[in-house]
Structures are given as C-alpha cells and as structure tokens.
C-alpha cells in the first residue's frame, strides 16, 4: 500500500476531486457536529495529504496525524497538524492512551487486515464518550477484484460492538465512481462506551 500511495502523493488530491470523492468532507463533519465549539484533540488515522482534516483545522482543534507513507506525510506537514507520526496503522500507535476526544479515519478500512484490533486500539486512545468517525467500504466486486476489504453492515456491526463502541449513526453514500461503477461507503459515527473501574 505504501508504494501505491507514494506514487500517488503528488496527484492524490486532484484525482479524488475528479472522482467526485466527498467522504473526506462528510465524515469529519459528523465529528465536528458532535464536538461543537469546545476545545478538543483529534486523531487523524491514515491522514494522507491531510484532506480529511481540512474542515477540522478550520475549527481550531488540535490534530495528530498518523500515516505510513512518507510522500503523503511530506504534503501533510504543510498543514497545521500538532504532530504527524509515520507508522503502519496496524502496529501499536505511538500516542498516549485516553488522550483524544475524537478520531477520524477516511478511505482506510479497505486496507485493514484486522479491523477488530484497529477498533480496539482506537478505543484505547479515546477518552470515555469519545467519538470515532470513519468510512467503511460497502461490499463491492470492485474491491474484491483489487483484493481489498469491503463489508455489509451485518458483517462490520458485530466487530464494532465487540471493540467497545456504540453506533451513533451510519449512512450509505456514494464514495466514488470507478470505470463507470458506483462504489459506496458506509459513513459511521461511533461512540466509545464508558469504562468501568474493573476493566478498560
């Protein structure tokens, strides 16, 4: 995946625009509406060139980005991230537990091999009641042909709940068009369930 995105880095934003890709606007907006005007720290997972945090920066939130592709990160560093960390999202993240009010992850789930592990890691980084906005690719032959992950709601819902999240909202929307084929996303807003004194 890193090799693919390193090659795309220079033209990535323009190509998404040409594909009429809007998930990078819709999912962050869900998080912004939930957080309101209070000061907040946000984790941008798979931040890429920073598109998924453009609306978030406008609100003045502190944003930490994580991405595995150096070429993408070089572009993201031009934006007002508080911190950017280069690492694989399926490795333990080098950020403190229970230190973020929200997380966003757009256009990443199709590459994640172990979604349950990733969801639990997100949960550990959020404060109690923290929110997680993300896209989940809706089951499609387009993804299967490319050896990427995609899901029906009934497949991903138990994974989400088992990881310790409640589903606040989910909406099926057009993600993009590929060779004339419409590819859909499920846009989710999740909330971390409250911890108890006996368990994390």
Positions of PLM-derived features:
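A short glycine-rich, Lys/Arg-flanked "PGG" loop and its adjoining helix->strand segment in the class I
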Residues: 116-128
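Core SAM-dependent methyltransferase catalytic element
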Residues: 177-200
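Conserved S-adenosyl-L-methionine
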Residues: 166-175
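Conserved class I S-adenosyl-L-methionine
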Residues: 1-35, 133-157
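Short catalytic micro-motifs in class I SAM-dependent methyltransferases
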Residues: 107-108
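Class I SAM-dependent methyltransferase SAM/SAH-binding core
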Residues: 43-45, 49-92
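A conserved beta-strand element that flanks and buttresses the S-adenosyl-L-methionine
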Residues: 104
């Amino acid at each position: 995946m890193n090799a693919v995105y390193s090659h795309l880095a220079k033209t990535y934003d323009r190509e998404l625009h040409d594909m009429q890709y809007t998930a990078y606007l819709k999912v962050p907006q869900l998080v912004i509406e939930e957080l309101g005007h209070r000061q907040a720290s946000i984790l941008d997972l798979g931040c890429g060139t920073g598109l998924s945090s453009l609306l978030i920066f406008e609100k003045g939130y502190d944003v930490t980005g994580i991405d595995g592709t150096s070429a993408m990160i070089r572009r993201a560093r031009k934006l007002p991230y508080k911190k950017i960390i280069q690492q694989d999202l399926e490795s333990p993240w080098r950020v403190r537990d229970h230190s973020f009010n929200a997380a966003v992850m757009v256009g990443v789930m199709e590459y994640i091999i172990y979604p349950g592990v990733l969801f639990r890691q997100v949960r550990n980084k959020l404060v109690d009641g923290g929110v997680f906005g993300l896209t989940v690719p809706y089951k499609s032959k387009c993804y299967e042909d490319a050896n990427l992950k995609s899901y029906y709601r009934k497949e991903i819902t138990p994974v989400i709940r088992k990881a310790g999240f409640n589903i606040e909202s989910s909406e099926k929307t057009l993600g993009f068009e590929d060779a004339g084929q419409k590819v859909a996303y499920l846009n989710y807003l999740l909330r971390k369930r409250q911890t108890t004194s006996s368990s994390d």
